Amino acid sequence: MSIHEECGVFGVYSQRQEDVASLAYYGLYSLQHRGQEGCGIVVNDDGVFDGHKGLGLVSEVFTGSVMKQFPRGKMAVAHARYGTTGGSNLANCQPIQVNHLKGKLALAHNGNLSNALQLRRELELSGAIFHTTSDTETIAYVITRERITAPSIQAAVSRTVDRLEGAFSLVMMSSTKLIAVRDPHGFRPLCYGKMKDGTYIVASESCALHAVGAEFQRDILPGEILTFDCDGIHSDTSHCGTAPKKMCIFEYIYFARPDSVIDGVSVHDARVRAGEILAKTHPADADIVIGVPDSGLDAAMGYARESGIPYGIGLIKNKYIGRTFIAPGQDHRVDQVKIKLSPVESEVRGKRVVMVDDSIVRGTTSGRIVQLLRDAGAKEIHMRISAPPFLHPCYYGTDIDSREHLIACRHTVAEIGEIIGVDSLGYLPLENLRDLCGSEEYCSACFDGDYPTSIPEDTRKDQFEQKLSQRKAGEKP
């Protein structure tokens, strides 16, 4: 009950005219957990782009009347947004559409650029006019500028990859091609699948492939540029291996859906392993193990399995409200917690409870959940967290924007436990983090401060928009 992720991207390429908008709709539905601020779909009907985007959930933005207005087409690009740069307004919703000298471009982006301000300044000095505060528009403009001299859109994208720093998983389309790109570190997931009729699907997670009936083909490699067109699939691996692979390990702990498989690792299995490790490193004398829905459930199963303590359903989630961390602003977050979870009193009353959750960022949500269980009659509450303490901001597409918001930066574990009101508190040990996925090829900078890339001084999630506002006001950033 903690941190939030960035966005979900989805793309469709078909050799024939079909209802690609509906495929994009169902794909976004499966990626809704990655972003709930807004969403958008752009359909390519023989080079004519038709798009719609709005603030809200997929079901709210794409009503039946809206979906009927989409033409049939051969391609579509779609996006579910949570803003890691730029404010929560319609202009910052994606996909971004750009008309340029040599054609059109529709772009959806998952991640966060660490050099967005520098690139934007260079573009503005050369005459670019921006309409959003999103770094996705910056990427789109870099591509279109490179396309002026590049022999093809693929070449323009390749040149753009050389200029981008940070995390970016992209799905874009020109008039004739669908292109998927994953940054050289592979911070964010991206994969593709194939339907029985030959239609190709690109998505942030494999769960979205299954939702539309596509068979998973493979993950897109870190640094790979994959192009789909009338001649088939073309893979450009010239950027592969130029940087160490650093997939965000928090995808497995919290962001991704448990039924997804990312880079060959089951998200569900990784979470269960986290719970098993917690049971060994932080045992507790208890009567029941419960998980905080949703991402704490799998880890709770692992804890119960390893400890031998019965697993139970102690908290029920209101499925019609989004993740607490996804709502922008602390006031919204507190309001949502009050209606999001309800305790199952018969399961917890008079019992010593082990409550497993994925993380504690600010402590706001955790304290409220603990109080819910106390009010329901829990005798003891032993909280176990399936990740190490958050000690450092993330600059690669999540909403851990500054150290001042991280409770673990200001308090010891014992103090945090006292603040949130538990009888004991235990985190997944940092040295056991790699055991979740059986590899060292992961980014864990939010836990250990070991950033894979250079980070601009004082960079924050909201710095991009703050500096843009200062420029407009004539201030020196």
Residue positions per predicted region:
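Flexible loop/turn segments at secondary-structure boundaries
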Residues: 84-85, 115, 187-188, 209-210, ...
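PRPP-dependent phosphoribosyltransferase catalytic core
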Residues: 161, 176, 213-215, 219, ...
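Extended, hydrophobic alpha-helical segments in both membrane/secreted and soluble proteins
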Residues: 289, 296-303, 307, 311, ...
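Short, glycine/charge-rich flexible loops or terminal/linker lids adjacent to PRPP-binding catalytic cores
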Residues: 308-353, 363-364, 391-397, 401
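A conserved beta-strand->alpha-helix junction
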Residues: 132, 137-140, 311-322, 419-437
